[in-house]
């Protein structure tokens, strides 16, 4: 048993933990910047978490273990002076222009500057930002005038993806962050997943914005602008309007999109149901033809880049069904014009995504037909929130409305795509019905749900048993492959999501304060919104979506055949 005193209060504990964690667990506030829970920074130390230990002096709380007899002061004059001095030093390398900054509402550094009344000794105000800003990537933007060199992006990349694509670099004697040899991230092993952006406490890292594309289209009279949001957006955007975590705001988003001026409001959940129609059909065909196995999902562009960069031998095993975003985009330029009488050239398709890698996917050269892009612009959850705020739309007070029916209806299977295991479960619901030519009532595959890194299950289809696996996060895919598990048994179907927790934890989602992350399992809470929708929808299988059935009957024909196979599939190659 250890006895310690913090700010005059005695605690008894058996824990072996750091001063920072123990203090926060006991509601004692200690400021921090470089520290992220479960992602400790062993590269750069910001020293913002400095505390004073009697007999020892000033120490950093994030990496100093508590010891019996410690007397700790978190708010002494020496502590406050040290922290203020460090913040002032950081201000000397940080462009302190908060007005136009996209992080001004949730900038962790700004809060520290205000709290400690810090000032720069020599303000950093570059006249020409060209050498500091890297916008070459289709997904990510780096603004080094904002970078504090805290190392959170480097550590988050290493822990969450194990690609170590984000690095500290030496440029003319100065330390910067970037890709190896200052290459464009797209030309490296980077997954473009955006976990580095989520980790960044300031605006040094952000998504490549498509907002100007969208605004220009909305202001072009000849353009018919349609929009569709991904499943996870409805589970998170409320956080950016002070509505708390885990609030379903589907109807409010539809209303806000109409007020922004979009001509038609559809839903990517419809695209998810389309993907399942094709993917489940493909799985059944492989079962009937005895392979090739395993079939991997292909709807996560971060995972696709991981396969391309590290395991190109697996590309032939990826499902050829387009992702919900791309398959929706294809339908928006073919089926939708056929029922609306519009010229496909005038249809401008926008998606709202929780993912930065979706921007890269949408801009792949092959993702077009007859010169028309499947998707014209991709905005993240954060970008949509900014558009709503810029338009002064009172989001939290909006009445709910519905999506437009032609491509806005969706099933519970489409809704759960945003959670790890959701694609697997949705596909199995339809594949089992297709293979057994029945409408089965037992539709929940809870063994593939949850946040474990590698989940396995055995499913029965037509009295035969099939092995499936769900890989939760890019780092766990590396573990799965390096362990040899893929060769230990015959897997038939494997889902992979690059981001831990799935799309609900994507790189385009709202920033969450690290202190909140220590208290709230954000992945679980956001996913609960999707599972709740699934549970309460009358149609819980993709092939029960009446608007989808109508589309196949009147335009695409049978899933996996003819026109459907020709334009709703894309084969990734080495």
From Swiss-Prot:
Domain 4Fe-4S ferredoxin-type: 138-167, 181-210
Residues that bind [4Fe-4S] cluster 2: 147, 150, 153, 200
UniProt signal peptide: none
SUPFAM superfamilies assigned: 2Fe-2S ferredoxin-like, 4Fe-4S ferredoxins, Fe-only hydrogenase
Enzyme class: oxidoreductase
Residues annotated as binding [2Fe-2S] cluster: 34, 46, 49, 62
Occurrences of domain 4Fe-4S His(Cys)3-ligated-type (ranges): 78-117
Entry cofactors: [2Fe-2S] cluster; [4Fe-4S] cluster; Fe(2+)
Binding site for [4Fe-4S] cluster 3: 157, 190, 193, 196
Gene3D superfamilies: 3.10.20.740, 3.30.70.20, 3.40.50.1780, Fe-only Hydrogenase (Larger Subunit), Chain L, domain 3, Iron hydrogenase, small subunit
Enzyme Commission designation: 1.12.7.2
CDD domains tied to this protein: fer2
InterPro entries attached to this UniProt entry: 2Fe-2S_ferredoxin-like_sf, 2Fe-2S_ferredoxin-type, 4Fe4S_Fe-S-bd, 4Fe4S_Fe_S_CS, Cytosolic_Fe-S_CAF, Fe_hydrogenase, Fe_hydrogenase_lsu_C, Fe_hydrogenase_ssu
Subunit structure, as described in the record: Monomer.
NCBIfam families in the cross-refs: FeFe_hydrog_A (TIGR02512), Hydr_FeFe_Clost (NF040762)
Protein name, per record: Iron hydrogenase 1
Organism: Clostridium pasteurianum
């Amino acid at each position: 048993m250890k006895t310690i005193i913090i700010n005059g209060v005695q605690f008894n504990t058996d824990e072996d933990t750091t001063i920072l964690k123990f203090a926060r667990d006991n509601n004692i506030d200690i400021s921090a910047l470089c520290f992220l829970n479960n992602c400790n920074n062993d590269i750069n130390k910001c020293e913002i978490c400095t505390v004073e230990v009697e007999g020892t002096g000033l120490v950093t709380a994030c990496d100093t273990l508590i010891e019996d007899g410690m007397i700790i002061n978190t708010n002494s004059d020496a502590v406050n002076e040290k922290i203020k001095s460090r913040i002032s030093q950081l201000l000397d390398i940080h462009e302190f222009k908060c007005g136009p900054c996209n992080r001004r509402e949730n900038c962790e550094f700004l809060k520290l500057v205000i709290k400690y009344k810090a000032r720069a000794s020599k303000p950093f105000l570059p006249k020409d930002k060209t050498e500091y800003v890297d916008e070459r990537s289709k997904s990510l933007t780096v603004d080094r005038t904002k970078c504090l060199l805290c190392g959170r992006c480097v550590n988050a990349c290493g822990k969450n993806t194990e690609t170590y694509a984000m690095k500290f670099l030496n440029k003319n004697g100065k330390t910067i962050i970037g890709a190896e040899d200052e290459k464009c991230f797209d030309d490296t092993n980077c997954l473009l997943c955006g976990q580095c952006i989520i980790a960044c406490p300031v605006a040094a890292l952000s998504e490549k914005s498509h907002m100007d594309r969208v605004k220009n289209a909305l202001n072009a009279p000849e353009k018919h602008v349609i929009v569709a949001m991904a499943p996870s957006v409805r589970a998170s955007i409320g956080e950016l309007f002070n509505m708390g975590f885990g609030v379903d705001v589907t109807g409010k988003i539809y209303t806000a999109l109409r007020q922004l001026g979009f001509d038609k409001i559809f839903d990517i959940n419809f695209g998810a149901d389309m993907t399942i129609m094709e993917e489940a059909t493909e799985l059944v065909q492989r079962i009937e033809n005895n392979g090739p196995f395993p079939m991997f999902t292909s709807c996560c562009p971060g995972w696709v880049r991981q396969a391309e960069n590290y395991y190109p031998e697996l590309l032939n095993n990826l499902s050829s069904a387009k992702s919900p975003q791309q398959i929706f985009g294809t339908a928006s330029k073919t089926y939708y014009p056929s029922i609306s009488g519009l010229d496909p050239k005038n249809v401008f398709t926008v998606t709202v995504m929780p993912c930065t890698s979706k921007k890269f996917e949408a801009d792949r050269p092959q993702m077009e037909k007859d010169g028309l892009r499947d998707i014209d612009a991709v905005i993240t959850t954060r970008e949509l929130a900014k558009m709503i705020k810029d338009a002064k739309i009172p989001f939290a007070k909006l009445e709910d409305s519905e999506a437009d029916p032609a491509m806005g209806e969706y099933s519970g299977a489409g809704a759960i795509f945003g959670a790890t295991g959701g694609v697997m479960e949705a596909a199995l619901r339809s594949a089992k019905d297709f293979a057994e030519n029945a409408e089965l009532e037992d539709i929940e595959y809870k063994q593939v749900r949850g946040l474990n890194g590698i989940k396995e299950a055995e499913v029965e289809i037509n009295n035969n048993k099939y092995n499936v696996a769900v890989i939760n996060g890019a780092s766990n895919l590396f573990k799965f492959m390096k362990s040899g598990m893929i060769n230990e048994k015959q897997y038939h179907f494997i889902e992979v999501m690059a981001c831990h927790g799935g799309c609900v934890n994507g790189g385009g989602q709202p920033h969450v304060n690290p202190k909140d992350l220590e208290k709230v399992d954000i992945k679980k809470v956001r996913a609960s919104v999707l599972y709740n929708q699934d549970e309460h929808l009358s149609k819980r299988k993709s092939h029960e979506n009446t608007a989808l059935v109508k589309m196949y009957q009147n335009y695409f024909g049978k899933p996996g055949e003819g026109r459907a196979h020709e334009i709703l599939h894309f084969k990734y190659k080495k």
